[in-house]
Amino acid sequence: MSNTILQNLPLGQKVGIAFSGGLDTSAALLWMRQKGAVPYAYTANLGQPDEDDYNAIPKKAMAYGAENARLIDCRKQLAQEGIAAIQCGAFHISTGGVTYFNTTPLGRAVTGTMLVAAMKEDDVNIWGDGSTFKGNDIERFYRYGLLTNPNLKIYKPWLDDQFIDELGGRFEMSQFLIANGFDYKMSVEKAYSTDSNMLGATHEAKDLEDLSTGIKIVKPIMGVAFWDESVEIKPEVVTVRFEEGVPVELNGKRFDDVVELFMEANRIGGRHGLGMSDQIENRIIEAKSRGIYEAPGMALFHIAYERLVTGIHNEDTIEQYRINGLRLGRLLYQGRWFDPQALMLRESSQRWVAKAITGEVKLELRRGNDYSILDTVSPNLTYEAERLSMEKVEDAPFDPIDRIGQLTMRNLDVTDTRNKLGIYSEAGLLTAGKDAVVPQLGSK
């Protein structure tokens, strides 16, 4: 493994590059060809909402000197992994109850495995991508690449001093393309960078690194700017149906194609700006970063799924689902979605939680993350109103005498707790005065 990362361009060898068609990868591909490598371009179709023509990207790669260029359709796998994350609640980052749905880590898990698998088919065993040394993706792609191909070598132009010296900035890269006969016009540089896939979009860096810069500078690509009062957003009632943990219907329409299901969920949630959040998070290397996120479809499914979870499962099961979800979310974020410890956690939730989740949830969506749940229907509900009805009911499951017995049994642990508080008070750990929060204990 010591020579896994190549710091210099491997001359005369096949080098696979994850090619987006943007300035960085275009310049890198042309530069590698001119310097003597044999570049192969691989583009992942992840259903990116900001990409208009996927088929044009491989053609562009060929023009820049790729020996071969392939478009890999990753959408179905990405949708399935998104559903798995919903089933497991694999989300560990939230602020004020608003969740980040780990959409970029899910995209990297799919891209990192499927592109490297495609490279193996072409006998390409060296891989490069555009991730920087300060971010999470460099480690995610490293892990997923080596899991897929243990013989893989990693070459990144952005870690090559020669490439940095010659083409170290956007201006230098654009001039390089122009000098080689390509009519490249630099796009207007935004105040932040955006990365997206079918599950969600990430906006970060540049102006967004300043915490005094709010969400309002972001132009959403998956929905509306719900904070803009000039944007008309009408309340909308939506019904989501799950069968054995899998979303299958939206507003009574059944979707056999999981990709189309997600696209429709994105359209519905996007009309309201549902699923947008502003998060400060810990990167893999423990430094904090800030991101603005969109995930309208994931948010819609998550809300409906968790409503059914709370109506169907008991308290201990829900607790384990949430604890395991936090752990699994962090593993996913770290690029460990297919590691044994993650598979163990996934198995428990996908088998013992998700399989019971069948039913429909009706919601009213308003602006942003403002919504109401209007109805919850499932043949598996353990919620039964008559069990705890405040009205008099026939054949009640328990009566006052039963509750007296249950409360009497509590005397055992109340007595133990009282004794422990006395011990702590005598040890000086608690103050049992008249103004103390701890109840006055009196004599033992």
Swiss-Prot record:
EC number: 6.3.4.5
GO biological-process terms attached to the record: argininosuccinate metabolic process; L-arginine biosynthetic process; urea cycle
Localization of this protein: Cytoplasm
Binding-site positions, L-aspartate: 132, 136-137
Keyword annotations from UniProtKB, A to Z: Amino-acid biosynthesis, Arginine biosynthesis, ATP-binding, Cytoplasm, Ligase, Nucleotide-binding
Annotated ATP binding sites: 18-26, 44, 130, 132, 137, 195
Cited NCBIfam families: argG, PRK05370.1
Quaternary structure and interacting proteins, as annotated: Homotetramer.
UniProt similarity note: Belongs to the argininosuccinate synthase family. Type 2 subfamily.
Protein name: Argininosuccinate synthase
Organism per entry: Mannheimia succiniciproducens (strain KCTC 0769BP / MBEL55E)
